[in-house]
Structure formats: C-alpha cells, structure tokens
Amino acid sequence: MLTNTESNEKLVVLYATDTMADWEYGYLTAGLGMAGGAIRLVTAGETAAEVDTMGGLHVRPDAALADLDPDDIAMLVLPGADTWAEGHEQVLALASRLAASGTPIAAICGGTLGLARVGLLDERRHTSNAPDFLGMADGYVGAAHYSDERAVVDDGVITAGATAPLEFAKAVFEALGALPQPVIDAWYGLYTTGERRYFDALVGAE
C-alpha cells in the first residue's frame, strides 16, 4: 500500500495510461514543484507496468491503482488519451468514490469523457473538447450543464479541453490550496503573456 510519508503533504495522483497526452499535464506537474514538500505527486496506472505517452515517452508508474489508499488522496488527475471511450473501469470507480467523499478530481480532454461515462458530469457544470465529444459517452445526460469555457470547476470536479492545459493547471493549483494566490497569478500571467513583470513577481514570491 502506497501511503503518504509525511502527514502534512497532499498526495496528488496522476493517472498513467498509454497514449496519455504529454502537453496536457506538463504545466501541472512542473508547477506543482513550486509547492515543495506540501505536495507529493505520484503516477499510478491500472498496473505498475510501463506506459507509453502520446509523445513516445516511456513512463513507469510509481504504483498500481490498487496500491493506493483512497483516503490518502488529495486530488486525482485524469489526462487525455486516445482510449477513454471504453475501459479504464478501475480508475473511474476510484473517481466515483472520491467524488462521493468530496475529494477533488481534475480531468482534461479524454479524461472528461471518462467522467461523462460514469455520470460525474450529469449534474455538474463542465467543459471538454466540444459538446459532441462528450456525446460519445453512453448514458451521458449532462449536456445542459456544458459550458464553453477553458476550464470549469463545479462541486469538486475540474474539467478542461485539450487546448487549455494552463487553465487546467491553474484550477488544480487553486483547488489544492498549496500555493499562495499571488504565486498562482504570477505563474499564469507569465505563461499566458510572457511578460517580464510576471517573472519578477514569481521569482520575488518564492
């Protein structure tokens, strides 16, 4: 069983699966490093076997999903991949359990399709790649709650489309509360505008 090594750190689980879209979680994982010891980021897959990302990187998960104690998880992150139209039952069951207990879940691109498949978007405001993308999910009845935004947060569930990794990461940072808001704002300003003033603010806040 994988458990937290420090009682005050927050365990963030990034789901590792074949064809996971590298750009969708890159800003997120790098940005979490700014939180230092406040965050422990682990990758977890259906098994601990190596997966290949969409960009061709070989990732060996830190753990299998079965090795995790759901009570230890502070956030579950579901990246996009080419395979979300079916399967992934183990991680989707975990997502449903976490949502029921109030633990935040963050899904981007294909990950939102997974949430739609298990009903987690039926009553929450959400976004994705497009409304008809989520329409591929059997049983999805949440179309009235779809919002054409870069990222949406509602009732503990963060959703974003494939082209919004920055907004996705920002929403995760804010939900975790592991970084001061001025740091998040400076980080977001830097990567959306490239302006020096945000870099100076970010460095000055560290």
Task: Name what the model sees in each region.
Residues 52-53, 128:
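Acidic surface patches and DE-rich sequence motifs
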Residues 55-61:
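Charged, often glycine-rich, active-site loop that binds/positions anionic groups
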Residues 2-20, 30-47, 62-106, 110-206:
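Active-site-adjacent pocket-lining segments in enzyme domains
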